[in-house]
Amino acid sequence: MEKLPILFIFDFDETLSVRASCYPIEELAPNKEKLNLDDINHGYVHVHHCWNRRMNEVHKQLAEQGINTEQLIEAFRTIELNPGTAELFRDIHINNHKIIIISNACDLLIEECLRAQNLLQYVDEIKSNPVRQREPLIIIDEYENPLQTNCTFCQPNLCKGSIIDQYRNSNRYDKIIFVGDGDNDVCAALRLDKADYAFAKYDEESETTYKMYDLLKNQYFKQLKTELLLWKTMKDVHDILKKKNIL
């Protein structure tokens, strides 16, 4: 009987990466006050809701302070990954399964970060906002054009659940395993079936409330068809998968 691969899908910011990927970029600013982050964040939260547009404005402000594209790309390469990521990726690859990253960051950032740590080779595909222009400054387009209006969990520029549906409908997998942390990962978890697994970030010792866990546990638990598993580091994810004889 044919042995089907497992599809592993990871969020990037604060899932694979320790911090949100915007922080090392914004820290490049010689004068952070001149980034006008209050105005930029207001536009994101109250006007357009598109993360790529927010970052385009940050890149523009950085360019006005003399930060060039190569400095931005070097910042992408310094993004710290969650402990255990390398070992987990290698084990998934050795077992002939598939790794997909779905992220509201941008494709270039994720590629450069993973390439710098020799992990890009294990990733089958990255679904994220595409970089349209590198010079004189990096400009990121929306992943979805026209903007999506069907999903209220996800931002208009990228719906993670619809991407999961596309993979499920176009390929055959033994199961789908999704790992995330934020509110825009709820949609992805709710698209999973009974045989799949959803991993939500949770740290009982931290004061941080991780939205994926909080929303799924307290508001959408009855709509969740799959088992909800908790993680703090990628080592936790790896250990759980081994205990379940998935890896």
Write out the residue ranges for each language-model feature:
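Short, flexible hinge/linker loops that cap or flank conserved catalytic cores
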Residues: 1-2, 170
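Alpha-helical substrate-recognition element adjacent to the catalytic core
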Residues: 2-130
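C-terminal cap/substrate-recognition subdomain and adjoining C-terminal extension
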Residues: 84-98, 105-247
